[in-house]
């Protein structure tokens, strides 16, 4: 590992998408006295196992504006970020029509290119021009974002780390933060680790699903004004179909957009047995990094008390929070619901550990705010990987510029009652 400094103006905790992005932009703006600390390594957390989808499709106006900014950052260097700008499709039933129309209209208002197809017949025709084997029922709207797409998770993080180092930032892995030292005013003056102490002027916490641990270290409130718990965990469900990535191409042989479908049509397995008659959703894409068709479904909430949830070991190494046969059956059946080519493909599901935990806020949307005078917390509520541009905005705020894009995500919204609107999607982050 690189030597741990005894002091640094900026100490960033977490070498994932937010920590590395913040380090890069701070250093690029002339603030080179910055160190990123990670207990394991670059991309060892949620960013490193992310499916990699980059989209603007959000019902919440503040999220759309923020994501439009992040897409621009992805587009700034596709090669370094291993970014594939293939576009994104939100495919929906009638119950979501009003939401989708609103998203489309507001995307137009901010200059984000997309196309809206409405009506069951027109939607079916549109999809069959891309995939002749398209057969999903109950679809009444298709929102086709021409920008967005997906990136290869670990490759993009390595590219981001390279940019941060080239700009002058220091990245030290294998260091576990154990405590914060505060002065009498409550300002953090140093960060204690298992390898020594680092005095600092600013701390940035970009720890993904581990954010609660640092929140507790800082003795911040366990509940918000409404009485709801500040944190809760959801288990993420993703997997890979063991077929060549080219198995899922458009009829013309090119890569398709990332597909996300929500449906209220009852879903059955290949034997005709009903899986669910409630709202369901999946997303999927051909992926040469995963070497198959990769995607996922809606996560499920972990209902035990948050203090009893064990984050480590994380992701595929977890003995508990990995996908099982129920996910495989549901996801593969949903793929078959959409395309004839996936009929009978459950046997091709890749049986390997997959999954992870996301740490969610009370309203399932991020908190970007300063606490304890000089601690900036990036709590992404599992929206993180796609938000490559947040680090740029945070770096600007740390240097004294207030960000209009980050303002709707302050912690004070819970006391003020200015939380974000809720959509009809089955996904907590939509």
Ranges and model annotations:
Residues 24-28, 54, 79-87, 198, ...:
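Active-site substrate-recognition segment that forms the wall
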Residues 51-130, 139, 279-282:
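Dinucleotide-binding Rossmann-like beta1-alpha1 core, especially the glycine-rich loop
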Residues 143-202, 206-213:
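Helical element adjacent to the flavin cofactor pocket in flavoenzyme catalytic cores
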Residues 27-47:
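Glycine-rich FAD pyrophosphate-binding loop
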Residues 3-18, 35:
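Beta1/beta-strand and adjacent pyrophosphate-binding region of the FAD-binding site
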Residues 65-66, 91-99, 143-163, 322-330, ...:
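Short beta-strand to alpha-helix junction loop
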Residues 322-430:
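C-terminal catalytic lobe of FAD-dependent flavoproteins
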